Design a protein with these regions (language model features):
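Catalytic or ion-translocation cores adjacent to nucleophile or general acid/base/metal-coordination motifs
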Residues: 176-209, 304-333
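Short alpha-helical scaffolding segments that buttress acidic/His motifs in well-ordered protein cores
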Residues: 9, 13, 27-28, 39-44, ...
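An N-terminal structural lobe/cap that precedes and organizes the functional/catalytic core
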Residues: 8-9, 13-22
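Accessory "access/gating" subregions that flank catalytic or transport cores
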Residues: 84, 88-161, 166, 181-276
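Domain-length cofactor-binding catalytic modules of enzymes
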Residues: 249, 255, 269, 273, ...
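Active-site cavity-forming subdomains of large catalytic enzyme subunits
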Residues: 20-84, 128
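Single conserved hydrophobic/aromatic residue that forms the stacking wall/gate
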Residues: 1-7, 12, 335-338, 342-345
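Conserved phosphate/anionic-ligand binding catalytic regions in large, soluble enzymes, centered on
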Residues: 153-181, 218-219, 223-229, 278-314
Length: 345
């Protein structure tokens, strides 16, 4: 299913990379939000009203709905940001039309930038990042949410909106933004980026809840599954390095590499139980988006633009398997008591 969805790029370009007439004006521009994930979720739920077969959960119809949503997610994300940037920040409004010949990465860069200009390297690196974020099994929070909500028999738009609500949380899709802001805070405390003692001191203060958000976390380090290394991060590392060299940001990339190398040592010294930790895919994602001049408000929406493909595949899988409704098992730790008639009257 997943390969079929990914392989439908030409179908997306030719037929579905467009929103209903006046949708941008009547929905996206009318009630702007300062949170792009909220904006996208609202738009997805509103698209239900434009679908004559919105509640039809047959496989063919759901596949059609999923392909349409995959195709318009870049538009919902970027247009939502432009609406916010104009109406709430009083900046110029840019609403470009998506070209059917462009890839998803090219559409994002073209719609986002006033002059629509981007380099082939920029598009290639962003495309790689989207692919790496596209799917990560059924155990992550938003994908599991898709399974749970789909098992109830609800429509595609409601299931995707629920997945968006999950990804919106800072413990899930918001991690790449946290990494970026953490490094911005590091730069305020450490003036010499080559001073490894100063870097280690800052990392220790992070773990001691003395700096940044005081949560005791080094964002971008560690993963529930990838405890030795995150293969997605290793691929992204090389791509971001090429882009940083091309854009003249060698020093900043070197800073990220130093923190990636030093953080496991600091965590090993500070934690009593230590099984190893490595940088995850979020570690370099924020730097990549920064090098592409993508605003922080769009970091998590770009995650969603990629992950909608995985959600779609898992929704179809759940429907094809015709499973029962998913509900958690519960264990009561209270003592059972015989019901006393009239006890609460």
């Amino acid at each position: 299913i997943g390969s079929g969805l990914v392989g439908s790029e030409m179908c997306i370009r030719d037929r579905y990379r467009t929103l209903p007439q006046h949708f941008v004006r009547d929905v996206i521009l009318k009630a702007t939000s300062n949170d792009m994930m909220n904006s996208i979720a609202r738009s997805v739920l509103t698209l239900f009203c434009y679908d004559k077969n919105a509640n039809d959960t047959s496989i063919d119809n759901v596949l059609r709905q999923c392909i349409q949503l995959i195709s318009v997610f870049p538009l919902l994300s970027v247009y939502g940001y432009h609406a916010y940037n104009h109406y709430q920040r009083d900046n110029s409004l840019y609403i470009h039309r998506a070209e059917p010949t462009m890839s998803t990465a090219e559409v994002i860069l073209s719609l986002l930038r006033p002059d629509r200009h981007y380099t082939p390297l920029e598009a290639k690196v962003l495309d790689m990042a989207l692919i790496l974020h596209m799917e990560h099994g059924g155990g992550n929070n938003s994908t599991f949410t898709t399974h749970v909500v789909t098992s109830s028999g609800t429509d595609t738009y409601s299931a995707v909106a629920a997945a968006l609500a999950s990804l919106k949380g800072p413990k899930h899709g918001g991690a790449n933004v946290k990494v970026y802001y953490m490094f911005e805070d590091l730069k305020k405390h450490v003036k010499d980026w080559e001073d490894e003692d100063a870097l280690e001191d800052y990392l220790e203060k992070l773990l001691d809840k003395q700096v940044f958000d005081k949560k005791g976390l080094i964002y971008g380090m560690g993963h529930a599954v990838y405890t030795i290394s995150d293969p997605r991060q290793q691929i992204l590392h090389g791509a971001v390095k090429k882009l940083a060299l091309a854009e003249g940001h060698n020093d900043e990339f070197d800073l990220y590499e130093r923190v990636e190398r030093l953080a496991p040592k600091v965590i090993g010294r500070k934690r009593k139980i230590y099984k190893g930790v490595a940088a995850n895919v979020d570690f370099y994602s924020g730097l990549l988006y920064s090098l592409l001049d993508i605003p922080c408000e769009l970091y998590t929406p770009l995650f969603a633009t990629a992950r909608i493909t995985g959600w779609s595949a898992h929704r179809l899988e759940e429907l094809i398997n015709c499973g029962k409704i998913i509900r958690p098992a519960s264990v009561s730790y209270t003592h059972l008591r015989a019901h006393e008639t009239g006890a609460y009257l």
